[in-house]
């Protein structure tokens, strides 16, 4: 069978995965789950709103009103209410063009009850009360586009390759980036960095499964001297001794407590507990222990009985709430605290290593579902508070309470919109506490950059932190996170990208799991004696210790069978930790997992026949999972599995006759799947030095190509389109799923590696001007300008028109002649900088001629002009309406021809700018008359070790001759010798060298050139967007120095380092010229006696400080220095300028 299973079979399986799942499934599933279940859960958690009138004299009965919320409904499809009140179905493309929000209205059932002392007097149910609107994720099951075929998508103006997974808010596409966090309900034990009062500490962040309240953190410290264990509880100001906590839970005798911690006679552990036992002897009674906790948590002056009640409540609700928040959970909590103590002591005794914070199994990713749920909870609370306030007012004023008016739907609508539009996740009022950058504008530079953005994972740590550990690549990232794709600089290693087949679990309830475990004979902690614990295996479900079992092997077997037969969710992870005698079952959301082939007796369970069925379309990916051929493992379970890298290893092992045999449980589908989106487009990444792959992953996002097939219909602020994008000659198998061949971003250029003239030194390249003239690497650049008529004051609106110089005030020094009478420019007009594209006038009140009764308005110009540095042709003009006002967008296109200074790069981060363009007749040529398009310098190769670049060139040559794509998928066993022999069979020199002739002289060159087709990308950094110079120009108001930046016509900064260079040259006159004369020279007067600033001029010379009216000198100093002197004077420091005689 193994011999029958080939690499091709692997790719058939992978294709079926992407056919069914796509690349943004994790976003869509998470959003769907939020709408289907999480929203209703938030509503169900909320308490009933009860309001009662204040008691008034003479009236005995108080009026009480209760409002409860019921079922919530999301309408499909998304709609928009026009200014005239009509409701229309809104399609995504219309939302983008008209700057609308693509959102569905929410409705909710509300029950209003009027109560008296006797009970409910009157009950009324209002069904489907408007409840705001929710932005809808594109291609989720609530989107108009869900399930449509390619033809229908094209009719709606959508790109059929677009996979959705983002929102449209105010016309801009927003993606929610996954946020990484530590897993809750897990015990972590760490060593404390010394010096400190304690040596080790254990902590657990506890969150109950269904609620999303803030985590309650319990931490346990092993103190240095004396060696006592103290526990820090939530809301308790001081640490509580361990045994006092146990007595507060109702366990009084030392023996009883120790039985809950140690299950066997362990001398060393008992020694470590001795000090704690002695510290606890002072408190022997439960109430005394509760009062000990109460005193340290209740406000000062609380009576003792109340303190004890408060402490009991705190132990129930705040201590390990994930185990239970009701009464009668004390036994479970006592056992769990004992488990934490045991873990702490094991680490302290050196029998177990401290936990690793960066282990990926201990991380969770919050996708749009959990993030929107926490936002919705905040907004819903706000709405409840607002509704309560409204009801209270109504009752006090004796008005009837109207549900439709009382529910302020705009709270929900505006809250969602604000969070998605700004990326500040949380309440607008508390903007300082919120997380920034959760929602980002979707990167649409090219198709790969879009996909990559939808699979990004962010770690919310301060980017300034110098900690290396969280940024490093961890062993557990294998297959979950791309090892290459991460930004350089500040966010390096903190912003990650998911690997190709990684998926993030959406989570399922633990209820059915616990029921099944009970059926399988798991004994509950309440029913067992402590003596049983020593030999038994502990069973944890989502961090809750549910019981023990005596036959772990059997239990694991039946659990895995259940998962493979799909009676249990396929995302559930089942981990057996043999050394610690634990079985951990996890079903929570946010665990990254990936598919692997199941292996039984060192043979794959899947057969060649199954793959043939898959190819014929008789079965799909889901059938492979349900048949138990493939299963999803998360990091924790993967660590407890034995995974073969490929089927060859399995075959070798099954033939192995030696005594030492390895029993594999799973097999990788293909090792190339450890890479993410961007790294998957690199040919032979396994032959490059690793940082080169990282650089290319960043540059691939800046390459021009076609970002969407509907780019002509879209009105993006900025976009670049390559004229003739080509699919690469040398491809990887993964590109097929990234649609790189359909929407490429580059061209196959003929590249020679040689020193030819000196114009390709230091990473510059020589490009063939004749090839550029034929259209090589030409591109279009589109920019969209937007404007809207709006209300300047009630009843007076702005207006699109062609402003005339006499009638309109404050007209800028621009060209208004190209506008039509309606104030808009017509398509096809050639425009340059300072041409007006949209003419608009704004009415302002004329204070001289207006009276209160008859206001008189004059108009000022507020037109939109082209950017000063750009030229182009008007491509499209649209006029539509938004909120009842005219709204216009103008798209201007300009052609960009490669020229000196433009940046290009191969797919191996070999980037360079054009140093010179030579015409075809000046370029070197081969005996067949073939001329290179690009010549790069040989010095670019050795130090960078991008061998992949050379192999790509070699394989590209073979592809061009054979007419089939070259396969450069990593880890696929392609060898240079194999390619060389094929190249030789086509009659070329086997290592890709060519005899060339000098284009200038026609003589044969002594050296041969390495020459062949290589895929090159044109990057967005173009010299036309950067070229800048200035003589005189605008100044800053405060310092009177030139302003900064090309767009403001700013100066060029002469910085500290430049200053140091000129000082070391000793060129003082030049230094004075740069730093003062041409920057901010200023003449002022200084008193000769006291050296302070004085008044001076033709009429008066006077120093107020020392009443000197005769000796005042004029000095020339930088204005910034004058400013500094005055600021120091304002701080009561007197800087005096002294003159040499």
From Swiss-Prot:
<keyword id="KW-0548">Nucleotidyltransferase</keyword>
<keyword id="KW-0460">Magnesium</keyword>
<keyword id="KW-0808">Transferase</keyword>
<comment type="subunit">
    <text>Component of the RNA polymerase II (Pol II) complex consisting of 12 subunits.</text>
</comment>
<dbReference type="Pfam" id="PF04563">
    <property type="entry name" value="RNA_pol_Rpb2_1"/>
</dbReference>
<dbReference type="InterPro" id="IPR007642">
    <property type="entry name" value="RNA_pol_Rpb2_2"/>
</dbReference>
<keyword id="KW-0479">Metal-binding</keyword>
<dbReference type="GO" id="GO:0005739">
    <property type="term" value="C:mitochondrion"/>
</dbReference>
<keyword id="KW-0240">DNA-directed RNA polymerase</keyword>
<feature type="binding site">
    <location>
        <position position="1090"/>
    </location>
    <ligand>
        <name>Zn(2+)</name>
    </ligand>
</feature>
<dbReference type="GO" id="GO:0005634">
    <property type="term" value="C:nucleus"/>
</dbReference>
<keyword id="KW-0804">Transcription</keyword>
<dbReference type="Pfam" id="PF04565">
    <property type="entry name" value="RNA_pol_Rpb2_3"/>
</dbReference>
<comment type="function">
    <text>DNA-dependent RNA polymerase catalyzes the transcription of DNA into RNA using the four ribonucleoside triphosphates as substrates. Second largest component of RNA polymerase II which synthesizes mRNA precursors and many functional non-coding RNAs. Proposed to contribute to the polymerase catalytic activity and forms the polymerase active center together with the largest subunit. Pol II is the central component of the basal RNA polymerase II transcription machinery. It is composed of mobile elements that move relative to each other.</text>
</comment>
<dbReference type="InterPro" id="IPR007120">
    <property type="entry name" value="DNA-dir_RNAP_su2_dom"/>
</dbReference>
<dbReference type="Pfam" id="PF04566">
    <property type="entry name" value="RNA_pol_Rpb2_4"/>
</dbReference>
<dbReference type="Pfam" id="PF04561">
    <property type="entry name" value="RNA_pol_Rpb2_2"/>
</dbReference>
<dbReference type="Pfam" id="PF04567">
    <property type="entry name" value="RNA_pol_Rpb2_5"/>
</dbReference>
<dbReference type="InterPro" id="IPR007121">
    <property type="entry name" value="RNA_pol_bsu_CS"/>
</dbReference>
<dbReference type="GO" id="GO:0006351">
    <property type="term" value="P:DNA-templated transcription"/>
</dbReference>
<dbReference type="Pfam" id="PF00562">
    <property type="entry name" value="RNA_pol_Rpb2_6"/>
</dbReference>
<feature type="binding site">
    <location>
        <position position="1103"/>
    </location>
    <ligand>
        <name>Zn(2+)</name>
    </ligand>
</feature>
<dbReference type="InterPro" id="IPR037034">
    <property type="entry name" value="RNA_pol_Rpb2_2_sf"/>
</dbReference>
<dbReference type="GO" id="GO:0008270">
    <property type="term" value="F:zinc ion binding"/>
</dbReference>
<dbReference type="InterPro" id="IPR037033">
    <property type="entry name" value="DNA-dir_RNAP_su2_hyb_sf"/>
</dbReference>
<dbReference type="InterPro" id="IPR007646">
    <property type="entry name" value="RNA_pol_Rpb2_4"/>
</dbReference>
<dbReference type="GO" id="GO:0000428">
    <property type="term" value="C:DNA-directed RNA polymerase complex"/>
</dbReference>
<dbReference type="InterPro" id="IPR007647">
    <property type="entry name" value="RNA_pol_Rpb2_5"/>
</dbReference>
<feature type="binding site">
    <location>
        <position position="763"/>
    </location>
    <ligand>
        <name>Mg(2+)</name>
    </ligand>
</feature>
<feature type="binding site">
    <location>
        <position position="1087"/>
    </location>
    <ligand>
        <name>Zn(2+)</name>
    </ligand>
</feature>
<comment type="similarity">
    <text>Belongs to the RNA polymerase beta chain family.</text>
</comment>
<dbReference type="InterPro" id="IPR007645">
    <property type="entry name" value="RNA_pol_Rpb2_3"/>
</dbReference>
<dbReference type="Pfam" id="PF04560">
    <property type="entry name" value="RNA_pol_Rpb2_7"/>
</dbReference>
<dbReference type="InterPro" id="IPR007644">
    <property type="entry name" value="RNA_pol_bsu_protrusion"/>
</dbReference>
<dbReference type="InterPro" id="IPR014724">
    <property type="entry name" value="RNA_pol_RPB2_OB-fold"/>
</dbReference>
<keyword id="KW-0862">Zinc</keyword>
<dbReference type="GO" id="GO:0003899">
    <property type="term" value="F:DNA-directed RNA polymerase activity"/>
</dbReference>
<feature type="zinc finger region" description="C4-type">
    <location>
        <begin position="1087"/>
        <end position="1106"/>
    </location>
</feature>
<protein>
    <recommendedName>
        <fullName>DNA-directed RNA polymerase II subunit RPB2</fullName>
        <ecNumber>2.7.7.6</ecNumber>
    </recommendedName>
</protein>
<dbReference type="InterPro" id="IPR007641">
    <property type="entry name" value="RNA_pol_Rpb2_7"/>
</dbReference>
<feature type="binding site">
    <location>
        <position position="1106"/>
    </location>
    <ligand>
        <name>Zn(2+)</name>
    </ligand>
</feature>
<dbReference type="GO" id="GO:0032549">
    <property type="term" value="F:ribonucleoside binding"/>
</dbReference>
